[in-house]
Regions:
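Accessory nucleic acid-recognition modules appended to NTPase machines
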Residues: 1-97
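Switch/connector loops and helix/strand junctions flanking conserved nucleotide-binding motifs
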Residues: 32, 109-110, 139-143
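Short beta-strand/turn micro-motifs composed of small residues
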Residues: 79, 103, 133-134
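Arginine/glycine-rich "motif VI" loop of SF2 helicases in the C-terminal RecA-like domain
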Residues: 67-68, 118-126
């Protein structure tokens, strides 16, 4: 019913002392519990909940796809003491890292990529790519090893 994502860090101590992120596996149930329906999501009436629901949905989808992945990975989240955040961090057994940021917006701003840039810096040569999934329709390069992609990309890969 729930999933717990441990915190990602470049060392074991950071992973152990940081708080995990908990979310419901069923995003429809989560939306119902907070009183959000399809109409309010479309109209962004409940925008304070939209991002969290979308993030939970994407995390659940990635966890499902993990079972079929050619490269086994674990799923984490990242938040540091300065406020840098990456919603989801996939890490392979060889410690290769992919950062995934989720935005409910149809347009993007420069600040939306700061967390991915930070994780890229922390992971160093183990960083494979950073992906910002958003409600837009275009895939766009946003810097070395980083892309913005529509959320629908989850089903087209």
């Amino acid at each position: 019913l729930i999933d717990v994502l441990p915190a990602w860090g470049t060392n074991l101590t950071r992973r152990v002392i940081s708080k995990p992120k908990v979310f419901l596996q069923d995003s429809t149930m989560a939306a119902s519990l907070v009183g959000v329906d399809a109409e309010s999501l479309e109209m962004q009436i409940s925008s304070s909940f939209t991002g969290g629901l979308l993030e939970s949905f994407v995390a659940t989808e990635l966890l499902k796809q993990r079972e079929r992945s050619a490269v086994p990975f674990n799923l984490f989240h990242f938040r540091d003491s300065t406020g840098k955040v990456v919603d989801l961090v996939m890490e392979s057994r060889s410690r290769e890292v992919v950062g995934v940021e989720v935005k409910a917006a149809v347009s993007l701003q420069g600040k939306d990529f700061s967390g991915l840039r930070h994780v890229q810096k922390l992971a160093g040569n183990k960083f494979r790519c950073g992906i910002l999934l958003y409600a837009g329709k275009e895939s766009l390069p946003i810097g070395p090893g980083r892309w913005a992609m529509p959320i629908s990309t989850l089903w087209s890969v």
